């Protein structure tokens, strides 16, 4: 019996060592990303956000607000400022802000009016409140320009990442209501209609043309590739979609990825663009505190996988050496709700 016990102990120790070796091998095979981006949109400051601790666990290099940071819907500047201040009191967000760089853009509800565009009366004042919340210095050029668009450059030992943040509100032309179907809006072929406005378009072209980054992420608060649902989307301005695709292609910029929000759903869209050597991905992540839980389907010819209608946030792991991006729709407690890998 004594000999049997010695044999059993030996087997257990051998198995433990073998398992340890296997785990080490698996861990070694898992590549550590060179740069981690976390982003999300549609956040009500008065509602619980379960994700701030999870986001920190991902150890992101940057957090990008995709718009609707707060739900203000007001032309009262003091009220707008007070609602932003409420978000600043959220403990989990404060911890994130103290540990991770935070950048981003606005959408309609933090801009100040649902589905709002260029005709919003206090857009200039709203811009300053937004920049205050984002802690943009008073002497920044962004304080004197029209619109909240900006670019941010990051460098790691393996390479460079550029994040281009667009403003799809300040200059956007009027939407056309669709009275002939159950959709809210319909596309316009008016060549003067715009999403970005002349100055921002020129700026975007310069940013992409002059970029030597290994990955170029474009944050658009509204979806770019999903354009059939009839809500807000670049698809309501098809000539602008064509212009964006041509701008990306002609620039020669590497690894262009589109991020978007707004819709209270999360999904991956992917399209082959003529002249572009890699597929264009639009990663929609929305929303953080509330979602389209009654979602029952909508067309999107570019969709990859399924729509996630649960609350979620987005993670992009960038591997510069392998020229690969891993996109993950994340739920609470580190749950991966859906993922997509793309080579560039």
Question: Where are the language model's segments positioned?
Answer:
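Sec-dependent signal peptide recognition
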Residues: 2-9
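Metal-dependent phosphoester/phosphodiester hydrolase catalytic core
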Residues: 18-344
